[in-house]
Regions:
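Membrane-interface segments at or immediately adjacent to transmembrane helices
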Residues: 194-273
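Serine-centered coil/turn micro-motif
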Residues: 14-15, 25, 222, 353, ...
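Short, well-ordered coil↔helix boundary/capping segments
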Residues: 99-102, 126-129, 221-226, 468-478, ...
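Solvent-exposed soluble domains appended to multi-pass membrane proteins
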Residues: 259-265, 273-276, 281-710
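Alpha-helix initiation and N-capping motif
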Residues: 129-132, 220-224, 247, 295, ...
């Protein structure tokens, strides 16, 4: 032990104890030279950092060289941004320390981007920082592994220790800062130059102000600029023609053409919208061949019911943004680079959606999703959109997972959807279903033994395994579609279902790989039991539900009516300008289209359909265990004693167990459904007062042993 302490003391003396040291004249001349030409060295270092970051992001030295060659001016502009950040060192005496911090900042961001791109197509952006707590809190997913988390923690820890040592023992500028005012003025000039040079670069097409393809944008214009734009370019820009009169003109145009709704919450059909996670028809991929059709139900519905291509705003990731467009009718093209409105504007602003529109005519509105309720801040977002209920995985008795163990299977969503219908027998329902079974990452090692569906046309063995896994999961999604439509066919209720892929899978697909020629095109299909005619159309995600409701006689809401009356206009520019105007007015403007009032306030969202209750509590006769009996417990049911959570074990949907030492006679017991970050989504309908059998009472409590099936 003494030797260990001796070693630690040596390290401490070497790294963290500053000793005066006499340097040679040559050393001081070198320092003076570096200080004199520091701007030149900053420029060189800035270019080196940008090049290294591009190597990391592209995971290829050759690709980084091609970027510099093909987009030289963009490379220089990225370097200029890093160069400006280095000018901050002139405000400090410990300039070497400041340079290391700035270098580390950009390099760490580049490393994070490289790690992100190894698991998805969409690069790392500012909004991802807000998702990190939720990602880290998720279990049974492939967003983060224990190994990755360990590397990140140790890497940051080592860098922090190095910074401490450098701060203590590193060089310090000893010259007189005689021109502090000039330095600050020079620094201010550089930072003021950023928006000016950015505007020039955008106007000359050196870089772009909007990325229709985020991944391609990062490739073409560099990580430093692209990430920086996600930091400063958030929200919507105010349209130049935004004013009350122009908004009223758009509204008047819509009102003169819109139709009258012919149904209500008692006579209208049930509407089901299904987001099929990462769903892609294998027939759409030019190089891929499958031994037999893995999605026969999908193709049968595509043949017999209305269907078409769906233009979505993301590829490989970003489900929430396709979802946002589909539910609200608003377009992501007017937001900042890589933005998630769920994580920004919807944090504080309510937003008209299909749910609030249908609620106005008496519909009950629901969301069913077999993943965490907090992910993408969905619980908040669905409330802001006006939904009545949200059944997330925390409210489901999930027992089955996909072959790689990452995601719950989707079959449970059928019964959960039927619960939403049964809960409102005298109302029509809108139920939005979000699947996860086909979610990436797709393993490059064989996972499924003797797979039913095999692929060819893929040379790389790892990618062949990934495609094999994916097409077999597509078959599971197809089975879900059949089970859902079969179950709906048994019910004597008019129903229309629209199903769509939110984006293509994370498989590195290019436009040339797709029959559509566009990696931003997925497919949608429909089903109904009402005899509606087949009317195929290619749509944008923000038009999908306007089209669906139009076919069943529902013409509600500012945005949905706008699409229904204007989406087939021959003047595409006018159509997009009107959408931009209304979208800004609703989210960021004065809501002239609502006459300045809040027509669609946030709802009091209820988590889940099933009520959780406690029916009995008893002590074990053979161990220090207390059993809690009730209904609708799940793996996310947690026991609270006097409003404080205690360790508990899930035994079945009717039994939970806690340790005897955590409870005392007279304590109040509550069961809560708990999400990430200890968010309580729902509490049991009742509390139960614990009666300790070891304490004398007027009557004795039961001490029956539970069974696993209870």
């Amino acid at each position: 032990m003494k030797k260990i302490f001796d070693v630690l003391n040596v390290i401490k003396q070497k790294l963290f104890v500053k000793k005066d040291k006499i340097h040679s004249e040559k050393y001081y001349r070198r320092i003076d030279f570096l200080n004199k030409y520091s701007l030149l060295f900053h420029a060189i270092i800035a270019m080196a950092i940008v090049f290294i970051v591009e190597i990391i992001s592209r995971r290829s030295f050759i690709s980084a060289c091609k970027f510099v060659d093909a987009h030289t001016l963009a490379f220089m502009y990225n370097s200029f941004l890093v160069f400006v950040s280095f000018s901050l060192v002139y405000l400090f005496r410990r300039r070497a320390f400041a340079r290391v911090i700035i270098t580390g900042f950009w390099t760490i961001l580049g490393i994070i981007n490289g790690c992100v791109l190894s698991n998805r197509v969409t690069p790392f952006g500012y909004t991802d920082l807000k998702c990190i707590p939720e990602l880290l809190a998720m279990n049974n997913t492939s967003y983060f592994t224990a190994q990755q988390a360990t590397i990140v923690v140790f890497g940051l820890g080592a860098f922090a220790l190095f910074l401490v040592a450098l701060f203590i023992k590193g060089p310090k500028y000893t010259g007189k800062i005689r021109y502090a005012g000039i330095s600050v003025a020079f620094l201010a000039l550089l930072f003021v130059a950023i928006p000016v040079t950015t505007n020039v670069a955008q106007n000359t097409n050196v870089v772009a102000s909007y990325y229709s393809n985020i991944a391609q944008g990062y490739d073409d214009y560099g990580f430093v600029y692209s990430f920086s734009s996600t930091v400063v370019d958030r929200g919507m820009k105010k349209p130049e023609d935004y004013n009350k009169q122009n908004v009223e003109d758009v509204e008047q145009k819509v009102n003169s053409q819109k139709q009258t709704t012919t149904v209500d919450g008692k006579t209208g059909p049930n509407i089901i919208c299904v987001l099929l996670e990462s769903f892609c028809d294998p027939d759409e991929i030019n190089f891929l061949q499958v031994n037999e059709d893995p999605i026969p139900t999908f193709h049968e519905l595509e043949k017999n019911y209305s269907s078409g291509y769906l233009n979505v705003p993301v590829v490989g990731a970003g489900t929430a943004n396709t979802e946002f467009e589909m539910l609200t009718g608003l377009s992501m093209q007017y937001f900042g680079t890589g933005e998630y409105p769920y994580k920004t504007i919807l944090k504080q602003t309510d937003c008209e959606s299909i749910a609030s529109d249908l609620s106005k005519i008496g519909y009950a509105t629901h969301v069913v999703h077999n993943n965490g309720g907090n992910f993408y801040s969905r619980t908040n977002a669905f409330s802001k959109m006006g939904f009545d209920t949200f059944t997330s995985k925390e409210l489901m008795n999930i027992t089955e997972y996909t072959p790689n163990g990452s995601w719950p299977t989707d079959d449970i969503l059928v019964s959960e959807t039927m619960k939403t219908f049964d809960a409102t027998p005298n109302q029509s329902d809108f139920t939005y279903i979000i699947t996860v079974g086909t979610h990436g990452d797709y393993p490059k090692e064989p996972v499924i033994e003797n797979p039913t569906y095999t692929v060819s046309g893929v040379e790389d063995e790892g990618m062949k395994n990934a495609w094999t896994y994916y097409v077999n999961q597509l078959n599971e999604a197809d089975r879900f579609i059949k089970e859902l439509t079969d179950e709906l066919s048994k019910r004597d209720e008019d129903t229309i279902v629209v199903m769509f892929g939110d984006h293509l899978p994370t498989m590195g697909l290019q436009n040339s790989d797709m029959k559509s020629g566009d990696i931003y095109k997925t497919k949608y299909i429909t089903w109904n039991n009402m005899g509606l005619p087949k009317e195929d159309a290619d749509l944008y995600a923000y038009q999908l539900l306007a089209q669906t409701t139009d076919t069943v006689g529902i013409h509600e809401g500012t945005i949905m009516n706008y699409h229904q009356t204007q989406m087939n206009s021959t003047d595409e520019a006018s159509y997009q300008d009107g959408l931009d105007l209304l979208q800004y007015d609703i989210l960021y403007g004065k809501r002239y289209c609502y006459n300045g009032t809040d027509l669609y306030p946030a709802s009091d969202l209820v988590m889940g359909i099933d009520k959780v209750d406690i029916t009995n509590v008893s002590d074990s006769s053979t161990s220090d265990t207390v059993y809690i009996y009730g209904h609708n417990f799940t793996n996310w049911s947690k026991v609270y004693i006097n409003d404080s959570k205690v360790a508990s074990t899930y035994l079945s949907a009717g039994v939970l167990a806690i340790n005897k030492e955590d409870i005392s006679d007279g304590d109040e017991i509550t069961v809560c459904q708990v999400g990430s970050s200890d968010t309580i989504f729902r509490k049991s309908e009742n509390t139960y007062t614990y009666v300790d059998p070891a304490v004398e009472h007027d009557s004795e409590s039961e001490t029956d042993e539970p069974t696993e099936n209870q």
